[in-house]
Amino acid sequence: MSKENILVVIDPTRDEHPALERSIITAKMRPESPKMHIFIGVDGHAVDVSHKNPAMYSDVCKIAEIEQRMQKEGLEYTAEVCWAHDWQKSLLSSGKHFQTDMIVISDYCDSDKGVRFSDSKWALLRNAKCPVLIVRPGAEFKRKTVLAAINTQAKDERYQELNDKIIKRGKWAADLYGAEFHVVNAYDDSMNLPDRGTLLRKINMDSNRVHIRQGEPENVISEAAKELNADIVLIGTLARKGLLAAMRGNTSERVLTKLDTDVMALN
């Protein structure tokens, strides 16, 4: 089995890099450390890129510090600096070239303000061909609870496949960290109540770790995450095309805005 390829996104205008810290922690916990590709670039939709912003001026020492850290940890890595205007497309292009298995980005935004990500980051989540891990500053070193959010009521085959991906990746994360694994499924009314027995047989889990609750997904998932003190929540966000691709506020985006944990988004 070949090594996993992890693409770690660095914002050079920041002094702290939660995505890098989490990637190093995870790499050292794995039986075989992954190859890591450090993508250094500025998201112009999230940062003031004018000449008046002092954060846009940096010296090569910052990049050297990142490389020194990787060398100190003994991790295999490559690095690139990107000047392209379209951050999201450049990142996806780099991921394709590097044959990325997972992208790790930092989340510096305050979800209480109601705007958690820039348009380019939303586009990344919708269009990435691999899981995207969104890391909050100050995340716990050891993950104790992994929560996977699924939607078993969806009839579309793509959503059923997505549910399977979320469950598989959630179990993988829980095994890696030695954490408890929980599943949450929201439903809107009794006509759409998921069958607990069928769900338990499908995912092969204890009943007390499967949470089926009525309500809006963003409320049900965020409340379950708080009650369980989840360290990471896995959600699905299928790519959209045409007019829908330009719209904000779909279910996964509302869920992300409500959560105050690390999040792994899968397509």
Residue ranges and their predicted role:
Residues 37-39, 78-82, 133, 182-184, ...:
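General small-molecule cofactor/ligand-binding pocket signal
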Residues 70-78, 179, 203-209:
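A short helix-to-beta-strand connector/capping loop
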Residues 185-235:
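Glycine/small-residue-rich hydrophobic helix-like segments
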